[in-house]
Amino acid sequence: MRLDKYLKVSRLIKRRTVANEACGAGKITVNDKVARASYDVKVGDVIEITLGSKSVKVKVTEVKEVVRKEDAATMYEAAV
């Protein structure tokens, strides 16, 4: 699944266009490398999102095309 779509489906970022723009601006890294929106997300990837002064780092636990809002948080876990 594309990185921008994963971020939207997992509700880490609310809109896919915002995720796409953040990738283009270099604000999202996967496994410590700046990632493009077209990056293919895999289980085990560590995604770091830096927007403004906030930074979030998560580890991908599952990749699903469709997820209910209540279950979105099961797609990742906090990474240290």
Place the predicted regions along the sequence by residue.
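C-terminal structural segments of small proteins and small subunits
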Residues: 53-80
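A basic, amphipathic helix-loop patch mediating RNA/tRNA/ribosome contacts
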Residues: 1-43
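Glycine-rich, charged/polar anion/phosphate-binding loops
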Residues: 46
